[in-house]
Amino acid sequence: MLKVNVDKRILDICPQMKIGLIQADVVNGDTCDELWNELLKEADNIKNSYELLAINNRPAVAATRKVYKALGKDPGRYRVASEALCRRIIRGLGLYRLTTLIDVVNLVSIKSGYAISGLDFDKIEGDTLTLGVGEAGEVYNGIGRGALNIENMPVYRDAIGGVATPTSDEERTKFTPETTTVQININGYGPEMDMEETVNLMVDLLKRYAQATNIQTSIVSNFD
């Protein structure tokens, strides 16, 4: 598995951070009806459980927003992806039906509240991902967003640059229909759903819907 390092600036804010890591060989494709129905069922649960303004208070979302604020980033302007998905659901805007891998990650994201990085393993450069802090002027193209200002935002970097933030993953390492190996990081800046349970849920969904094999998992903490 890839090695994961975390910058001291982030650990100083959330010293109890846990990251669930999953690497697996998969088959991507159009989202099947069974997966889509699971996603819709969880969306209904979110809609029935939260008012719009209460989403910010979900423990995992609140913890991620706390990191943004502590680093000097406005989490109201640059929303955490799990928060943005839940807000969209509550506002009645629905979800986009995308591909199997994207919708599996989206399902776990809204259920757990965690910011989840879903990457094409074969597009990652090097053998290490480092979670650090975005710099002024750093080039980063968010998926479907174009240039994203990641200054003072938590960002995973590989050997050549940024690949994931809690707001958006990077175009360079995104899932495509041709993706055959995934690297998924479940980022627990603060606890909500049990991390082992969250990793197991992700693995189960990947097995059922993406024909996952050669699965490796790990939960990392105590980065000192």
Residue ranges of model-derived segments:
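Charge-biased, low-complexity intrinsically disordered regions
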Residues: M1-D224
